[in-house]
């Protein structure tokens, strides 16, 4: 009955648990997606600011991929959205750039839809003229397929261009697709009515890259029913990973 999945208090509780978990893991690099800055759905809580404040030892970069004053659907509507992807690093970052990805949607739908992008961060490697290139991504989900293909190709081209320079690359995030080398037999498609991710043929990235996911746990689940007493009834997916 509502697009608001949590109360304001619950969002703050969730953010506290998220930042506590990130601090306990103490990773060198963190790649986050769907971080709201000022969105009605999260009660306009600045999640990016909370993450920065609670992880003070990290430098950070943030890029919008969803920014609109009004999403007019469904009923009641989603409303205002200001959301993006966020990269945090314990290593000094020399540059961080937002790279625009191809948008498969036309006017007027594109006005209130996501504008997918990458954050490309570069870390100088001491004693060399090389860099570690970190790519944070969140690729298309609900298009007919052309957008995913175009965005995946652009990602592959960027990774290849950086390795051609002699740099090292790590790309990670939400591909909204499943790598062809991932065993998803534990998560069969339950219904043709539910969203199904397409496959990324990892051979498209060539032999110089390794595509990795951990399929021992799903990284996504459907939102077609209430969470209560339904843990074993959802459609599960493995759509997040690293290159």
Model-derived features with residue positions:
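N-terminal, active-site-proximal structural segment of metallo-dependent hydrolase catalytic domains
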Residues: 1-73, 77-82
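Active-site beta-strand/loop signature of hydrolases that rely on acidic residues for catalysis
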Residues: 1, 18-44, 88, 121-123, ...
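Metal-dependent phosphoesterases centered on the DNase I-like endonuclease/exonuclease/phosphatase
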Residues: 143-243
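Extracellular/periplasmic catalytic domains that process cell-envelope and extracellular macromolecules
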Residues: 23-24, 53, 78-81, 112-115, ...
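Conserved beta strand-loop-helix elements of the APE1-like EEP
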Residues: 52-56, 80-96, 124, 204-205, ...
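Beta-strand-turn-beta hairpins that frame and shape the catalytic cleft
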Residues: 81-95, 112-137
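Surface-exposed cleft-lining segments at the edges of enzyme active sites
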Residues: 3-8, 35-37, 101-111, 137-146
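Active-site-proximal beta-strand/loop segments in catalytic clefts of secreted hydrolases
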Residues: 1, 33-35, 63-66, 89-91, ...
């Amino acid at each position: 009955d509502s697009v608001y999945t949590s109360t304001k208090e619950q969002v703050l509780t969730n953010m506290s648990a998220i930042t506590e978990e990130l601090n306990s893991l103490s990773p060198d690099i963190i790649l986050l997606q769907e971080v709201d800055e000022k969105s009605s759905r999260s009660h306009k809580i600045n999640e990016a600011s909370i993450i920065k404040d609670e992880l003070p030892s990290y430098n950070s970069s943030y890029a919008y991929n969803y920014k609109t004053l009004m999403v007019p659907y469904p009923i009641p509507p989603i409303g205002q959205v200001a959301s993006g992807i966020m990269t945090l690093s314990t290593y000094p970052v020399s540059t961080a750039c937002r790279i625009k990805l191809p948008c498969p949607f036309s006017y007027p739908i594109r006005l209130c839809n996501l504008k997918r992008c990458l954050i490309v961060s570069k870390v100088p490697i001491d004693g060399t003229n090389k860099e570690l290139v970190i790519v944070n991504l969140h690729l298309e989900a609900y298009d007919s397929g052309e957008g995913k293909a175009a965005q995946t190709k652009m990602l592959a081209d960027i990774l290849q261009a950086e390795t051609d320079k002699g740099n090292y690359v790590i790309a990670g995030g939400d591909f909204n697709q499943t790598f062809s080398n991932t065993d998803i037999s534990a998560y069969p498609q339950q219904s043709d009515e539910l969203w199904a991710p397409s496959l990324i043929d990892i051979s498209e990235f060539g032999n110089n890259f390794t595509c990795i996911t951990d399929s021992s746990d799903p990284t996504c689940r459907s939102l077609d029913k209430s969470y209560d007493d339904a843990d074993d009834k959802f459609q599960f997916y493995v759509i997040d990973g690293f290159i």
